[in-house]
Amino acid sequence: MLDAFTKVVAQADTRGRFVSDSQIDALKQLVADGTKRLDVVNRITASSSSIVTDAARALFEDQPQLIAPGGNAYTNRRIAACMRDMDIILRYVTYAVFSGDASVLEDRCLNGLRETYSALGVPGGSVAVGIDKMKAAAIALANDPNGVTRGDCSALMSELASYFDKAAAAVG
């Protein structure tokens, strides 16, 4: 896992060069957006249970075969495992937002997930739909302007969306 600062230094060191002006500008923007970043992480964290529960509920309403007898999420134990996995993915998305870098999400959560799900017979497409539902809820929550730092958050929302997209692509 690398935060944005460590990653920039590692890249410059690998090339045997100083950190470039464009990299410094990008890091300045990351610092300038730090409070917004913390607001997003705090909002998602505070609402994580409802984000996961609502996304799972919507997924099972859209795909009732998953919870029907013989379905992949049939039985409370399997539903709980599905929701646990969704919660883990959401947690790692918040880590990525906090650090400004996707490597923690990719390295510690997504690598090998598709293969694991395939081996267990978990329908990756359904998991991807659940992730998309969490994405919609998290972005709506993060975009609410009440009680957060004012300013343009479009780049941060795009970044947040990209982490969910990476997760959905990794399982789908």
Swiss-Prot record:
Subcellular location: Cellular thylakoid membrane
UniProt key word Coiled coil: no
Binding positions for (2R,3E)-phycocyanobilin 1 per the UniProt entry: C82
GO terms under biological process: photosynthesis
Chain positions found as N4-methylasparagine: N72
Alphabetical list of SUPFAM superfamilies matching this protein: Globin-like (SSF46458)
Role summary: Light-harvesting photosynthetic bile pigment-protein from the phycobiliprotein complex (phycobilisome, PBS). Phycocyanin is the major phycobiliprotein in the PBS rod.
Protein name (record): C-phycocyanin-2 beta subunit
Species of provenance: Pseudanabaena tenuis (strain PCC 7409)
